[in-house]
């Protein structure tokens, strides 16, 4: 059955000489895999250049039962980027977040609130004119809400440790495991959780602190998501912002 929807590009894999497999998070059905024919002429209805990291694609696909790979018939840009492909910092963030989402989101079901969050965030990054150095950090902390991983902030007191394994702040250093962060870093993490895209530029954070926050967030997700790997694009992002 042919259906139209909008998707966010997470990953592209060469399938053979004539086709690619594109992983997208879609408004209609959540995470899904699509077969895209590599165009051989300028008149092709689906162009490979569309499928850039985090690109928003409006497309029509043949959703057939009893298969996990759907063929895309037509595709076009839903909201063409104005800055992400041309800004090396934004491009690096997009590459990192696309890989992160590809590894973190496995849900093959409609989740419109999550899709709306992703779409809003991507468009905000593309159009923002203010500082966005903390964007990926705020994005990942807010993403944890949709994945059921958001830490409990209610019991925080100054001087608390953050127990990453149990996702709670605690006044007592955890004794049964080493997956926790010290009080000074826990306070910085709490500050990060309270930021949003409009206010994050008001919070001062140097490169070392930013890199440490990213390492903590990445480790937090690895603790809570089975088989979450070390991301290849993480080093690229670190080098660019160093």
Swiss-Prot record:
GO BP terms: DNA recombination; double-strand break repair
Keyword DNA damage part of the UniProt annotation: yes
UniProt keyword list: DNA damage, DNA recombination, DNA repair
SUPFAM superfamilies assigned: ArfGap/RecO-like zinc finger
Entry's Gene Ontology cellular component terms: bacterial nucleoid
Endpoints of the signal sequence: none
Tree of life domain: Bacteria
Cross-referenced InterPro entries: ARFGAP/RecO (IPR037278), DNA_rep/recomb_RecO_N (IPR022572), NA-bd_OB-fold (IPR012340), RecO (IPR003717)
Membership in a protein family: Belongs to the RecO family.
Function: Involved in DNA repair and RecF pathway recombination.
Protein's UniProt name: DNA repair protein RecO
Source species: Bacteroides fragilis (strain ATCC 25285 / DSM 2151 / CCUG 4856 / JCM 11019 / LMG 10263 / NCTC 9343 / Onslow / VPI 2553 / EN-2)
Taxonomic lineage: Bacteria, Pseudomonadati, Bacteroidota, Bacteroidia, Bacteroidales
Gene: recO
């Amino acid at each position: 059955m042919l259906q139209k929807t909008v998707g966010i590009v997470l990953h592209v894999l060469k399938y053979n000489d004539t086709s690619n497999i594109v992983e997208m998070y879609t408004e209609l059905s959540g995470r899904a895999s699509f077969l895209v024919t590599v165009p051989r002429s300028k008149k092709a209805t689906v162009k490979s250049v569309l499928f850039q990291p985090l690109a928003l694609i409006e497309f029509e696909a043949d959703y057939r039962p009893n298969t996990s790979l759907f063929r895309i018939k037509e595709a076009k840009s839903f909201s063409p980027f104005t800055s992400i492909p041309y800004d090396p910092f934004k491009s690096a963030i997009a590459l990192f977040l696309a890989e992160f989402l590809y590894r973190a989101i496995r849900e093959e079901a409609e989740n419109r609130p999550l899709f709306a969050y992703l779409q809003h965030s991507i468009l905000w990054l593309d159009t923002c004119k203010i500082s966005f150095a903390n964007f990926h950090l705020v994005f990942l902390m807010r993403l944890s809400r949709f994945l059921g991983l958001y830490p409990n902030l209610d019991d925080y007191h100054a001087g608390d440790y953050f127990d990453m394994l149990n996702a709670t702040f605690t006044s007592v250093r955890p004794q049964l495991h080493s997956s926790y962060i010290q009080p000074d870093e826990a306070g910085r993490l709490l500050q990060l959780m309270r930021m949003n895209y409009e206010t994050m530029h008001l919070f001062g954070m140097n490169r070392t602190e930013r890199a440490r926050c990213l390492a903590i967030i990445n480790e937090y997700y690895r603790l809570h998501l089975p088989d979450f790997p070390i991301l290849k694009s993480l080093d690229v992002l670190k080098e660019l912002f160093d």
